[in-house]
């Protein structure tokens, strides 16, 4: 499969200039400024709140600001078009999802183009005595049904607390390689959840995070079972050590309770799932960047590329009548990126994700 990506409106990291306050007769009004004239504090918050994910838009070029320079609202996004040619009839989908590869296919060649990952966003940043540095962020693309708008992020962050809908705690955005394919690497954890999370940054070079998240459970059921309303949130925790701005090592975990109902007994039961993760990215000189991640657990298929669409969090237990079980899962990837120039790079990946081989349903 051959992939080609073209992106519009590329935005680089912004740099601070001397703070400028616009002085006129209406001190409480709103003005439009370019990002480089937003002032040191606004630029710092914009940069520090930028998530390390290649498909997230960077800071906007223009801002709406109050004339005291305390608050700024950015509106921005990008247009991204992807073209691909499939020489072997691999997957009838614009995304490369190995779990969907058929055992045989009549389609041998296929050309596709897609622009549904074009993204728009609103980002409000500022500083108050009560909230400290804060960010309110919403973003979406057009990956809903029939290319309709789909919400990707909607959250508020203040004093290291995040509330809302965004990337889950059982994943490492910084260790994801820069793939053209929007689906991302097979074997990585990737999901979004409504959550309450806290990040501790008080120890130099270390970062600790914990979150409570709304659960999402998919399972393979039969006439005997139904996936019930979930009674417990997911709990995640992680610790990360960084030795420079582009190198870190992270370990994390998740524990979850998955509720199901037996139609024969009319009774709700639950299965405990868990996951552990180790991930890293580090530079090898000025040109090379390495990426890697290993995930193992039970009942984490919902969060693991690319088996999240196979409904294998929980399945009927063939050894216990009337019971369901959480399947063991393993996923990993390793990548190496060569930066030809600041704007051009080459990437090679090896990855795998799978439920256990004893899947018996």
Regions found by a protein language model. Give the residues of each.
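Bacterial Sec-dependent N-terminal signal peptides
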Residues: 1-19
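N-terminal periplasmic/intermembrane-space "pro-region" immediately following the signal or transit peptide
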Residues: 14-85
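Extracytoplasmic loops and strand-loop junctions of Gram-negative outer membrane beta-barrel proteins
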Residues: 57-61, 101-107, 178-181, 220-222, ...
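Outer membrane beta-barrel
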Residues: 66-93, 103-217, 236, 240-243, ...
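Outer-membrane beta-barrel and related beta-rich outer-membrane complex signature
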Residues: 87-91, 151, 222, 263, ...
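Extracellular/periplasmic loop regions
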Residues: 289-329, 333-335
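Single conserved hydrophobic/aromatic residue that forms the stacking wall/gate
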Residues: 350-361
């Amino acid at each position: 499969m051959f992939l080609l990506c073209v992106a519009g409106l590329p935005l680089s990291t912004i740099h601070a200039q001397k703070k400028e306050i616009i002085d006129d007769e209406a001190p409480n009004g709103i003005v439009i400024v370019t990002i480089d004239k937003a002032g040191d504090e606004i630029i710092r918050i914009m940069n520090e709140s930028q998530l390390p994910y290649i498909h997230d838009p960077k800071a906007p070029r223009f801002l709406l600001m109050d004339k005291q320079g305390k608050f700024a609202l950015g509106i921005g996004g990008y247009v991204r078009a992807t073209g691909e040619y499939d020489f072997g009839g691999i997957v009838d989908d614009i995304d490369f999802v190995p779990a969907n590869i058929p055992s045989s296919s009549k389609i041998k060649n296929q050309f596709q183009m897609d622009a549904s990952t074009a993204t728009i966003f609103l980002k409000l940043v500022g500083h108050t005595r009560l909230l400290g540095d804060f960010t309110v962020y919403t973003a979406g693309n057009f990956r809903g049904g029939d290319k309709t708008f789909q919400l990707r992020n909607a959250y508020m962050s203040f004093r290291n607390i995040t509330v809302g809908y965004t990337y889950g705690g059982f994943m490492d955005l910084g260790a994801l390689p820069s793939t053209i394919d929007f689906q991302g690497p097979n074997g990585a954890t990737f999901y979004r959840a409504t959550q309450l999370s806290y990040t501790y940054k008080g120890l130099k070079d270390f970062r600790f995070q914990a979150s409570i998240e709304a659960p999402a459970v998919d399972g393979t059921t039969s006439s005997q079972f139904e996936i019930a309303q979930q009674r417990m949130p997911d709990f995640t925790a992680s610790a990360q050590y960084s030795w420079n701005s582009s190198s870190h090592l992270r370990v994390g975990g998740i524990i979850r309770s998955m509720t199901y109902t037996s139609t024969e007994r009319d009774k709700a039961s639950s299965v405990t799932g868990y996951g552990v993760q180790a991930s890293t990215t580090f530079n090898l000189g000025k040109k090379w960047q390495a990426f890697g991640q290993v995930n193992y657990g039970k009942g984490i298929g919902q969060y693991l590329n690319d088996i999240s669409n196979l409904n294998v969090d929980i399945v009927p237990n063939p050894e216990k009548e009337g019971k369901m079980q959480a399947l063991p899962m393993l996923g990993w990837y390793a990548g190496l990126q060569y930066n030809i120039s600041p704007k051009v790079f080459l990437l090679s990946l090896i990855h795998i994700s799978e439920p256990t081989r004893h899947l018996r349903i």
